[in-house]
């Protein structure tokens, strides 16, 4: 019996190996369900999960998330899709000119935000903002990084 649990753990890792190329990104851009749906269509996205981020409230809920933005956690395979490609799709699915919400969703909970975990992601986010700004031919000052 003492060998059974380690055997099960070893087999589960072998059957479902850990993807060392998996990366995560957190994006806010209006209603999280809309953003979740659009990002799931991109090849290389493992999953997209809705939630809240950016606030101080512990355990925010749909009814009570003051100070938080509606966000999506994007888990992706960096061998199949790049962060710049994900951010390009992100900018095509939000209104980057509106920092006070998205479409009919208004307020801080719906403003566009790109959360980053390191300098590389920060640089990619700023480059994506610059590229979108050039494409639209207007400055994008309403995107929060």
Q: Where would I find each of the regions flagged by the language model?
A:
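N-terminal signal peptide c-region/cleavage motif recognized by signal peptidases
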Residues: 15-17
